[in-house]
């Protein structure tokens, strides 16, 4: 399947829960993540677009450049951000290229409810330490 260029505002306007955003950078840290994970990308986020909320991006990052929509605070770890702001930050501030992959199929109300439970459970959770990861 061949990709098509889409303006960020158009991508945000058509965003649906379950869509995936992929990011690829060139910094030393980005390349390290790509190498360790054996992946061509170094960051992934999932769209959360429910009811009357603006489209959001649920992802985890070391930075705290944007306020978390769930807590209202700037935090590290698992975060929920306005989709447009998050993608713009990753492209402009962090120098990442971004790709969007739309979910095929439908999300039912029960899926949305479970997603909200998971977000409530994990939002704000920090990354494990390197020794903690090594112990697993």
Listing of model-derived features with the role each one plays in the protein:
Residues 1-136:
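Cysteine-nucleophile amide-bond enzymes
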